[in-house]
Amino acid sequence: MLVLLVRHAQAAEQDAEAFPDDTERPLVPKGRRVQRQMSRLLVKKGLTPDRVYSSPWTRAWQTARILLRETGLPKEQRIRADTLAMPPDVPTIAAEIGEIGPEETIALVGHEPWMSGLAGLLLTGDSALPRMDFPKSAILGIELERLEAGTGTLRCFFVP
């Protein structure tokens, strides 16, 4: 299976007055534009996901919607995954996502520092290794036989 880790696109700046609940910050126009480009790159590279799991936070949910639209997936393939809005724990994420076929590609849309931590867990079994810069709208692909810590191989890393 291929797991695509996607950091949400650029969102509105933190502003307690405009967004008292940080989870409600929406994407800004530049973030939407960059995410469309990154999503089209996946299509060009033949890495279109079969399903997209997303943190429920507005900026991640909107990023997932762009990913679906640009890759031609129906909206039913965007699935809420609350575990993507918290520190990474592979068994918990695996339990929420369920069965993934060996030829399937899934995308997980979330936040920093949790996306780089999840990448570290899947690649090395340690959320602190390798230390990486995971910018907004970046997409990191990891090949796995099963969704288990320390068993992944880096397939791609696209940075806008």
Regions found by a protein language model. Give the residues of each.
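Short, well-ordered coil/turn elements that cap or connect secondary structure elements
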Residues: 73-75, 103, 149
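Non-DNA-binding regulatory cores of transcription-related proteins
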Residues: 101-107, 112-138
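Domain-level recognition of soluble alpha/beta enzyme cores
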Residues: 126-153, 159-160
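Glycine-rich phosphate-binding loop signature in dinucleotide/nucleotide-binding domains
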Residues: 45-47, 99-104
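Active-site-proximal alpha-helix that buttresses catalytic centers in soluble enzyme cores
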Residues: 2-84, 88-91, 95, 127-130, ...
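Absolute protein N-terminus
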Residues: 1-2, 160
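Residue-level signal for well-ordered alpha-helical positions
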Residues: 66-67, 121-122, 145
